[in-house]
């Protein structure tokens, strides 16, 4: 998996860029699916990343139930509806042919829209982060990580 800053300890490992298509689906990069053990028909949890920022974390439901997320995930009753806990959005959805279908409600909750380009990175051992590329560019530029910004343009799009 490419690092945004090869040779720099702690640099984010990127899986690629996922695009939210006009019919509201996005693909999970294949290497991310392998790394996190995501299979066809898995139920996954989408959760707000940083409050007030676009994007979300994606966690397999079975994995989330073994973590601190369990207390929230246990309360979610339906698929593809947004549930709010502690001002963070949570939703369940499923993987179909390596893709995740979103709804207008989910897009609104995660401050996204069709055409959004999401950088898929290793967030934690259980979570893949999908954050708008523009947010990453702003944060990296603020810290002078221009090589990482340049490397983002070399990532595969899905």
Predicted regions and their residues:
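The feature marks the first
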Residues: 2-38
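Short, charged beta-turn/beta-strand-edge "cap" motif at the junction between a beta-strand
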Residues: 32-33, 50-53, 106, 124-127
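Intrinsic disorder/low-complexity detector
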Residues: 1-17, 47-98, 127-158
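Short beta-strand-centered segments at strand-helix junctions
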Residues: 22-37, 94-111
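DNA polymerase processivity clamps
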Residues: 40-48, 114-122
């Amino acid at each position: 998996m490419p690092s945004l800053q090869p040779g720099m300890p702690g640099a984010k490992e990127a899986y690629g860029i996922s695009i939210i298509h006009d019919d509201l689906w996005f693909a999970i990069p294949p290497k991310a699916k392998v790394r996190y053990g995501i299979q066809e028909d898995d139920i996954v949890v989408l959760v707000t990343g940083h409050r007030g920022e676009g994007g979300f974390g994606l966690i397999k439901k079975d994995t989330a139930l073994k973590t601190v997320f369990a207390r929230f995930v246990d309360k979610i009753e339906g698929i593809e509806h947004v549930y709010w806990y502690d001002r963070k959005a949570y939703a369940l959805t499923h993987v179909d042919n390596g893709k995740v279908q979103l709804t207008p409600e989910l897009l609104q909750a995660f401050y996204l829209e069709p055409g959004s380009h999401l950088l898929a990175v290793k967030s934690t051992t259980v979570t893949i982060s999908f954050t708008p590329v523009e947010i990453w560019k702003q944060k990296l530029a603020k810290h002078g990580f221009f090589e990482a910004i340049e490397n983002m343009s070399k990532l595969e799009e899905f």
